[in-house]
């Protein structure tokens, strides 16, 4: 009986070793492809929120990490991609979190030019209700295009609210919480950029260590 148990243990051990080796080999073979796909997805989003004619640098490489929960909605450092054109700063793409979505965090990226005018907004991830709150997704509706060309005049700019709250942005029928959360998050991101633009340009490019 002991011999049988030893054999079973040996078989299990060999199986575990083989499984671990398979996972390791699979990861080694696919990690470069996964990294490439992630980079291409990032490039696509960056070019959607910061137009190509606005920059001539490699945005994904010109990245700084900024930790500011009040402005960017997260305790974790968030990436900000700095655009430049002909060697001059020309805007940024700012990742931020709207922590008060109906179903939890909504991750967004906000593009701005050097005058802090919005050049694009995209929702990177969310868990909002299909058919209601998911209208923030560009694949569902063009609602986020309502931010284009707008800026924040001051920290108390009352235009930056949904119409139900006296602001300029549409809400959704039966789903006010979601657009309200996104509007507030975009406002905070734009105001942060507007008031920290020069400081951002002095930070070290450090997103590769994220």
Curated annotation (Swiss-Prot):
The modification FMN phosphoryl threonine is found at residue 176. It is a single-pass membrane protein. The chain crosses the membrane at residues 9-29. Its EC number is 7.-.-.-. One of its GO terms (biological process) is electron transport chain. Its main location: membrane. InterPro entries: FMN-bd, Ion_transpt_RnfG/RsxG. It comes from the Bacteria. Keywords: Cell inner membrane, Cell membrane, Electron transport, Flavoprotein, FMN, Membrane, Phosphoprotein, Translocase, Transmembrane, Transmembrane helix, Transport. One of its GO terms (cellular component) is plasma membrane. Part of a membrane-bound complex that couples electron transfer with translocation of ions across the membrane. HAMAP family: RsxG_RnfG (MF_00479). The complex is composed of six subunits: RnfA, RnfB, RnfC, RnfD, RnfE and RnfG. Belongs to the RnfG family. This is Ion-translocating oxidoreductase complex subunit G. The lineage of its organism: Bacteria, Pseudomonadati, Pseudomonadota, Gammaproteobacteria, Vibrionales. The gene is rnfG.
